[in-house]
């Protein structure tokens, strides 16, 4: 599906994130194709959006290269920074979050994955929209990260479960915990 979606608007497709899951899917086709351990998350935009990279922990290092550089892609440039004494690194595009074990919805994503994207592309207090809310994972992640949310779900069984999950998440936050 992501290939069709990406091809539908190549002029606005910018890049993809790859979610490496802890569980495979696609067992019914296992004799015809490899099991699927990843899902692609596509990023589209016309104008550069807010981007707050979620730094990854790595080994501390000091800068060892000269001050100026030349790149075939970017031309001449001046390096900035002096290394990473705390070991923090810019994120790569492969994210590892365990799959949800007990799901309400068949395509339910982990809250931590949604929190990652919400923190990457929004500021606290902003509104996050999910037009296919399913089990309300995005709403729970928005609450956990101090954002507001607008969600839509048209399937009555999922809507009921989603509203209960949001209620429980709000209660957890009031008790000083995170919603799940």
Model-identified regions with their sequence ranges:
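Core catalytic lobe of class I
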Residues: 1-161
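S-adenosyl-L-methionine
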Residues: 164, 168-180
């Amino acid at each position: 599906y992501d290939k069709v979606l990406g091809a539908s608007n190549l002029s606005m497709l910018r890049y993809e994130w790859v979610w490496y899951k802890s569980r495979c899917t696609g067992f019914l086709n296992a004799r015809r194709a490899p099991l699927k351990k990843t899902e692609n998350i596509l990023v589209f935009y016309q104008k550069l959006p807010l981007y707050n990279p979620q730094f990854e922990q790595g080994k501390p290092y000091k800068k060892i290269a000269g001050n100026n550089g030349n790149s075939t892609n970017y031309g001449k440039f001046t390096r900035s920074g002096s290394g990473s004494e705390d070991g923090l690194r810019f994120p790569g595009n492969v994210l590892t979050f365990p799959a949800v074990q007990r799901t309400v919805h068949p395509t339910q994503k982990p809250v931590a994955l949604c929190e990652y994207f919400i923190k990457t592309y929004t500021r606290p207090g902003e509104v996050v929209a999910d037009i296919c809310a399913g089990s309300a994972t995005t709403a729970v992640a928005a609450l956990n990260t101090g954002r507001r949310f607008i969600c839509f779900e048209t399937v009555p069984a999922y809507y009921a479960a989603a509203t209960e999950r949001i209620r429980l998440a709000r209660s957890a936050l009031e008790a000083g915990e995170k919603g799940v």
